[in-house]
């Protein structure tokens, strides 16, 4: 089961050159062994050092870039509306689109991935008011972290974030139960079970959810 770390409120920025401190600021329960490892290829875009524990932040690539991204996010930020309208799946088809639709008040929750915990967008997001993140490593992947971003000023925010994690775990369990099946068949069968509700908690348009379910059903019929 996934045990994500939750930021229940906006994280206060810290003035430091040490890479370890900024990660612990948004991910306080991360395992200490993480900092004994050498930075991976994606970390090296933002930090320099023999290990993550002694690494320092790169001024331009992390410090300045995070400041630029935070400034941009503040201009796009909006207070939570009284009600949310469905959005097109295309609006949230990129990492930026996913979090932008949340901070601009279009939907209460979104999800994206980062290839490094030093990603400037992730740190900038965590400092916005009423924007929270649940972070956990993607299984069977040495680099990716899944970020569930949600509005803390809407009751739907954390409710849907928690449900996303439940559905994510359900899909993983189904794929493990189908370990005798071909990988593509496992992926499609598990997707069929969670796809409709997943689309609903992401606030996608009903017609687009229906179209996606039809696509999944057609794909399954071709595989079986």
Curated annotation (Swiss-Prot):
Domain of life where this protein originates: Bacteria
Q: What is the effect of changing residue 191 to A?
A: Abolished cysteine methyltransferase activity
Q: Is Manganese one of the keywords?
A: no
Q: Which residues bind S-adenosyl-L-methionine?
A: 92, 98, 107, 111, 204, 208
The protein's Enzyme Commission number: 2.1.1.-
Quote the InterPro entries the UniProt record gives. NleE/OspZ
Record region (Interaction with host proteins TAB2, TAB3 and ZRANB3): 49-52
So what does mutating residue 107 to A actually do? Abolished cysteine methyltransferase activity
Give the molecular function GO annotations: protein-cysteine methyltransferase activity; toxin activity
A GO BP entry is:
symbiont-mediated suppression of host NF-kappaB cascade
UniProt-annotated location(s): Secreted; Host nucleus
What keyword terms does UniProt attach to this protein?
Answer: Host nucleus, Methyltransferase, S-adenosyl-L-methionine, Secreted, Toxin, Transferase, Virulence
Catalyzed chemical reaction(s):
L-cysteinyl-[protein] + S-adenosyl-L-methionine = S-methyl-L-cysteinyl-[protein] + S-adenosyl-L-homocysteine + H(+)
Keyword Membrane set for record = no
Q: Which GO terms describe its cellular component?
A: extracellular region; host cell nucleus
Assembly, per entry: Monomer.
Q: Function of this protein?
A: Cysteine methyltransferase effector that inhibits host cell NF-kappa-B activation by preventing nuclear translocation of host protein RELA/p65. Acts by mediating cysteine methylation of host proteins TAB2 and TAB3: methylation of a conserved cysteine residue of the RanBP2-type zinc finger (NZF) of TAB2 and TAB3 disrupts zinc-binding, thereby inactivating the ubiquitin chain-binding activity of TAB2 and TAB3, leading to NF-kappa-B inactivation. Also mediates cysteine methylation of host protein ZRANB3, inactivating its ability to bind ubiquitin chains.
Protein name per UniProt: Cysteine S-methyltransferase NleE
């Amino acid at each position: 089961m996934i045990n994500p770390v939750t930021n229940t409120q906006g994280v206060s920025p810290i003035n430091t050159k040490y890479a370890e401190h900024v990660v612990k600021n948004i991910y306080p329960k991360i395992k200490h062994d993480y900092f004994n490892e050498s930075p991976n290829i994606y970390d090296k875009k933002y930090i320099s050092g023999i290990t993550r524990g002694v690494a320092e932040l790169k001024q331009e690539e992390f410090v300045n870039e995070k400041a630029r991204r935070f400034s941009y996010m503040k201009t796009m930020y909006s207070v939570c509306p009284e009600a949310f309208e469905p959005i097109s799946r295309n609006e949230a088809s990129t990492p930026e689109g996913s979090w932008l639709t949340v901070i601009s008040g279009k939907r209460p929750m979104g999800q994206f991935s980062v290839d490094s915990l030093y990603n400037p967008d992730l740190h900038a997001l965590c400092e916005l008011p009423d924007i929270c993140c649940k972070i956990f490593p993607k299984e069977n992947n040495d680099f990716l972290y899944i970020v569930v971003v949600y509005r803390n000023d809407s009751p739907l925010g954390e409710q849907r974030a928690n449900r996303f994690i439940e559905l994510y775990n359900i899909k993983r369990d189904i794929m493990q139960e189908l370990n005798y099946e071909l990988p593509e068949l496992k992926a499609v069968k598990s997707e069929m079970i969670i796809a409709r509700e997943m689309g609903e908690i992401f606030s996608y348009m009903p017609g687009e959810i229906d179209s996606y379910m039809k696509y999944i059903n057609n794909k399954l019929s071709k595989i079986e």
